Amino acid sequence: MRDAENIREVEALGIDMMGFIFWPKSSRYVSERPAYLPTRCKRVGVFVDENTETIKQIADDYALDIIQLHGSESPDQISHLPFLTSRLSIVKAFNIATTEDLVATKLYEGSVDYFLFDTKGKSVGGNGEKFDWSVLSTYKGETPFLLSGGIGPEDANRVKVFHHPKCIGIDLNSRFELAPGHKDINKLKTFIQSL
């Protein structure tokens, strides 16, 4: 999300969180602060293998509520982010294709507030590809998670019937865009109303 008017329109839909990508290799990269930042939903900063000082600076500059780590950050690295854990929630993303991919979550139990389960794809997130959600039935961890990975307008019924005691929400990204970083308000509105 980069465009102030688009941010306002998405926020008006009553969403809980809005993501801002701070990974320079992403087509959704936020290179400069938008003229408007949301005030009625949580601001999520998405980082990929970023250094601690940069995360801290951006978290302060954007008044972030949540940090999403979408790279190969280790539990040890996360434990060295005390400035985050005292005032911000942390989400650790995992790329999922099979039940074996869920094993790594055990190392992060107690280190983060939420997991995000995304599709294992060619790039880091935003691939627009789905994974088989049935593999999540084997997830028995204590950490709540967000469901991600190519969820599109056609998936409303799938989302409605998906149940897991630790699933707290869904992440909508590339399948709801007019262009990278610019959401299609009509698609989002229709999808949200259908839930």
Region annotations inferred by a language model:
Residues 1-195:
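Conserved N-terminal beta1-alpha1 strand-loop-helix module at the mouth
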